[in-house]
Amino acid sequence: LLARIKQLLTLFSSEAENQLISAAQIQQLVAAHYASANFSISYLADNFHVSIAYMSYLFKKEMGENFSDYVWALRLGKAKELLLNTDMSIDDISLAVGYVNTSSFRRKFKQATGMTPSQLRG
């Protein structure tokens, strides 16, 4: 019984603390770090002092989509902007939006847009 009470108290206190995490706070942190190749849900969880599972739940609840889809959309948007408005190489753009593996970036870009980065650039 004591173990169950302790478990419930931990859960409730954790949830109460985490209610203080807002969508704006999440967006601010994601916007500041999405281009880092090491950026992950665990980084967010560590920053907000919550578990990865809870951060995943909270992210989806607050942002309306899962972490990886949200970050990919940011990276894709920035990549398109750089392709259309700069003369940066595709390799440099890949790195600038958080992809160390350019092949992976090109493949994912084509899956998302139906064209390669070079085709978008024209």
Language-model regions: role of each:
Residues 22:
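N-terminal pre-P-loop "Q-motif" helix
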Residues 28, 61-100, 122:
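Terminal helix-turn-helix DNA-binding modules in bacterial transcription factors
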Residues 119:
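C-terminal interaction modules of eukaryotic adaptor/scaffold proteins
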Residues 6-18, 27-39, 58-63, 80-89, ...:
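Basic, amphipathic alpha-helical hairpins
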Residues 42-71, 94-116:
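Basic/polar phosphate-binding segments, predominantly the helix-turn-helix DNA-binding elements
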Residues 2:
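Catalytic-core segments of nucleotide cyclases and related cyclic-nucleotide turnover enzymes
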